[in-house]
């Protein structure tokens, strides 16, 4: 799948469009086919790693999650075995890690 990938902290120059593996679905997770993702201040903070204290949660030397983006809207493609409230085909929006990709 296509995704925006970030291997290090910095400005927009650290972002790279690449093909990566589609995320695996955990037992209590949902796979979303992304139709839209927004960019906001929180994404900028996570991308730049500033203030430095944030890196204790997001990765000291480089981001733990290489695909940025948190706000997402799309269609449910798959569900884990413990998911009860959603079904494939449902349209959803919300917060997740890795929204800047074809699947999150």
What is each residue range found by the language model?
Residues 6-8, 95:
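A generic structural motif
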Residues 10-15, 41-42:
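Short N-terminal binding/cap micro-motifs at the start of the first secondary-structure element
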Residues 21-39, 52-98:
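Glycine-rich beta-strand-centered segment in the early N-terminal region that forms part
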Residues 99-104:
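Short, Lys/Arg- and Gly-enriched loop/turn segments at beta-strand edges
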Residues 15-16, 62:
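A short, acidic/glycine-rich surface segment
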Residues 1-4:
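Short structural boundary motif marking the start of a folded domain
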Residues 6, 47, 77-78:
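Short beta-strand-to-turn element immediately C-terminal to the catalytic PLP-Schiff-base lysine
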Residues 44-54:
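Short Gly/aromatic-enriched secondary-structure transition segments
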């Amino acid at each position: 799948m296509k995704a925006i990938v970030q291997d290090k902290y910095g400005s927009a120059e650290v972002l790279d469009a690449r093909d990566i593996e589609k995320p695996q679905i955990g037992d209590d997770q949902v796979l979303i086919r992304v139709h839209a993702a927004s960019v906001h201040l929180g994404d900028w903070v996570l991308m730049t790693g500033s203030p430095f204290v944030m890196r204790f949660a997001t990765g000291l030397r480089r981001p733990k999650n290489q695909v940025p983006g948190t706000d997402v809207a799309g269609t449910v493609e798959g569900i884990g075995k413990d998911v009860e409230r959603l079904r494939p085909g449902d349209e959803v929006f919300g917060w997740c890690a890795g929204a800047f990709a074809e699947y999150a």
